[in-house]
């Protein structure tokens, strides 16, 4: 009799234990997947991003904006609503954190603020949270069903931000790519980030920059026929002067996974100033030699080009460049409109 009761007792205890485990696993599982009677959810991936809404200031050395991509399956036959206004939360222990509203479609950032999921359908949704590096959180998903009296259970997903440190460290790569691009192609410098981060037709862009300079100098020398070897020397001097005097201050103002927007504050050597200096030397030559031969006068002025570049200071641009980039095969491509701006600023020397 005692043995029989013991078996019954053990069976009852086991049943209660299994029931408890079943209830727990229905709302929370180890890892980044979880389910309830209404939904099944999985964190597919996540990455740190930068939003333009705060002009790129959402990131410091320890915190950042994390884009979390979640795959949600509606297990019911009816549509459900899972939106970031009241159905999605981030938990830091007892602290509840609301998701951020982000709308930067130019770089692929767009939260799913009103997500309807049809019956038996699967939807990939994105949510944005301000988080700390190397910290564990939980994402809570609580959908609304058509039956207002039947409140859905909140599903909890574990989120370990340490897994996404690589994306945090790469947030400023677009700015590094812009700086390496300009220094390599327009200043003639070697930048370690060029081969690592930049995708560009180097020969084509360098040729375009040189052509812009040559056209500008042809005007500045009043049509004087400057031979190719002399023009090449002038261009080399100009690039060396840019490398010495020009300043570049790029910053990422918005960045998604594979798109970015960079603002470039810069200074450059104005070829308008060089134009004026060449004219002054030509005028000086004509006055000293009592001649009106402008071609000969400008041939003399060209011989002073190195000194002119030495004496000419860089000037700050009155506006910041806006540069759009795309990530392709692990490297950043710069939009063609920005290349035109670079040619104007660092080829033609127009500020």
What positions do the PLM features span?
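Core segments of small alpha/beta cavity-forming domains
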Residues: 164-240, 246-248, 273
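The feature marks short-to-medium sequence segments in extracytoplasmic or secretory-pathway proteins
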Residues: 73-123, 287, 291-294
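Bacterial signal peptide processing site
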Residues: 22-25
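Short, solvent-exposed, Trp/other aromatic-anchored flexible loops in extracytoplasmic proteins
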Residues: 100-138, 304-319
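C-terminal motif of bacterial Sec signal peptides marking the signal peptidase cleavage site
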Residues: 16-20
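Short, surface-exposed ligand- or partner-binding patches at beta-edge/loop junctions that are enriched
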Residues: 130-156, 337
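Short beta-strand edge/turn micro-motifs at domain boundaries
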Residues: 96-100, 150-152, 318-350
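Mixed-charge, low-complexity intrinsically disordered segments
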Residues: 271-317
């Amino acid at each position: 009799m005692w043995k029989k009761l013991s078996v019954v007792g053990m069976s009852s205890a086991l049943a209660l234990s299994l029931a408890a485990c079943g209830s727990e696993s229905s709302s929370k599982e180890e890892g980044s997947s979880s389910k309830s009677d209404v939904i099944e959810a999985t964190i597919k991936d996540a990455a740190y991003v930068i939003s333009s809404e705060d002009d790129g200031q959402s990131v410091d050395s320890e915190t950042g904006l994390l884009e979390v991509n979640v795959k949600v399956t509606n297990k019911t036959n009816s549509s459900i609503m899972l939106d970031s206004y009241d159905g999605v939360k981030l938990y830091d222990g007892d602290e509840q954190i609301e998701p951020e509203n982000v709308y930067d479609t130019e770089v692929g950032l767009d939260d799913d603020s009103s997500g309807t999921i049809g019956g038996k359908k699967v939807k990939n949704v994105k949510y944005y949270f301000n988080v700390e590096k190397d910290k564990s959180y939980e994402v809570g998903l609580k959908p609304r069903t058509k039956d207002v009296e039947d409140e859905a259970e909140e599903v909890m997903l574990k989120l370990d931000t340490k897994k996404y440190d690589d994306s945090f460290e790469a947030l400023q790569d677009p700015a590094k790519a812009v700086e390496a691009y300009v220094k390599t192609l327009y200043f003639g410098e070697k930048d370690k980030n060029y081969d690592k981060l930049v995708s560009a037709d180097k020969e084509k862009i360098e040729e375009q920059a040189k052509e812009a300079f040559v056209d500008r100098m042809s005007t500045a020398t009043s049509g004087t026929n400057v031979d190719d070897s002399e023009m090449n020397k002038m261009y080399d001097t100009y690039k060396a002067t840019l490398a010495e005097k020009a300043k570049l201050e790029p910053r990422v103002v918005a960045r998604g996974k594979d798109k970015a927007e960079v603002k470039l504050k810069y200074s450059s050597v104005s070829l308008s100033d060089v134009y004026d200096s060449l004219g002054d030397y030509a005028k000086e030559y004509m006055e000293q030699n009592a001649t009106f031969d402008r071609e000969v006068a400008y041939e003399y002025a060209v011989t002073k080009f190195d000194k002119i570049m030495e004496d000419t200071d860089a000037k700050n641009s009155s506006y910041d460049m806006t540069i759009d980039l795309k990530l392709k095969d692990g490297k950043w491509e710069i939009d063609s409109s920005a290349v035109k701006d670079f040619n104007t600023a660092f080829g033609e020397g127009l500020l």
